Amino acid sequence: MVDSMRYISTRDESRTEISFSDILLGGLAPDGGLYLPAEYPQVTGDMLDRWRKLLNTQGYPALAAEVLQLFIDDIPADDLTAIAHRAYTFPKFAHAEIVPVTKLEDGMYIGHLSEGPTAAFKDIAMQLLGEFFEYELRRRGETLTIVGATSGDTGSAAEYAMSGRDGIKVFMLTPAGRMTPFQQAQMFGLNDPNIFNIALEGVFDDCQDVVKAVSADADFKRAHRIGAVNSINWARLVAQVVYYISCYLHVATSNEQKVSFSVPTGNFGDICAGHIAKQMGVPIDRLIVATNENDVLDEFFRTGGYRVRSSADTFETSSPSMDISRASNFERFIYDLLGRDAARVADLFGTQVPQGGFTLADDPAFSKVGTQYGFLSGSSTHADRVVTIRDCYERLGIMIDPHTADGVKVARGLRNEVDTPIVCLETALPVKFAHTIKEATGREPDLPDRFTTIMQAERHVTDLPNDVDVVKDFIAAND
């Protein structure tokens, strides 16, 4: 247990420290920054040995409780244990291990993150977040209005995690017509009086901009008790740190062995948790950033230039959850890379990013991206995804979704630069992207039994224009 775990904003030069519970229900810091621990807790070899035994004997929830205690000191340990065990149960998760790891081929593994209720990796963080929110709201006697944006998987994971919970309403913005039929059915088929689906004109980043504008209106945020579940919420990252540790423990037989991860990446949330785990001292070798055609992050890790794309330059791809023009969690990594220089980060992300981006190509810190922080990157195309899905299915008998295929393709392309086992983090089950799977394999993906009725469900969704005030009015009218 950390003596005093406190959190600071990436843009706060005074490093004002606040508790986990005080950042849990919010998203952005008041100054527009993102929260990170004032110091990362450190993992020792003895802790890894204990956790390896714990994972083997008591399972994923027990490991999660121990990791959470490193980051949270204002919720009693017994309560954290109960929260973790409620979040990670079988059959809510379809596999008793919660996050099983299987071998794909020599030197490469799949970390199965999609066994949850909506078949996406985001269930792992969202189920924990739902428990945290309900616990903290009950403790405070308060209610919460969640306003979020999704390109597909986040929204359904959030809605299923928050559905039926006391004192929580959800308003989820989606880009109209940009999600797969299965994703739409999952979200819009949920019949809950406290869940509101909004189909917004535009792309995912337009949805995210509206959410940020709503959160930036301090009076509106206070009046309607607005909270966030998008990947900028710190509690989601904490939840994701756990599965990096569990995957590491599954693959590495001793603490001397290092493991690398290949992570399909859009918003830099999933791989940011890997960065945090590495900074904690978990023996992670390389962190491989795998993008699709929307290669904002690959471009940065190759050139040092972070160039925000316009909506018109954001491609609609067959791995749509990664169709982003800028990465909302990236600020956290840049804060660490620049020696936690809050003034510089505030300038980069508060001033330069809204004007199109920045470059660190000539900054001495950029050389640390690979050497100190372990990052590699690559991008993938639709043709790459189809070939990778077909190869995994025909040669290995394993069906993967298009986002996971991006991760596998990029990892294979960098195999000569990585001399440690690579865990490719799965992002979703193939059923969520049936069109691309059929194109690649000639057959429909299997539909897990738990989803057999979803496509016939009545739809619950409201179409709105890309207008912050109209969205605010809708929230106010239904809050």
Language-model segments: which ranges?
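PLP-dependent amino-acid enzyme catalytic core
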Residues: 2-479
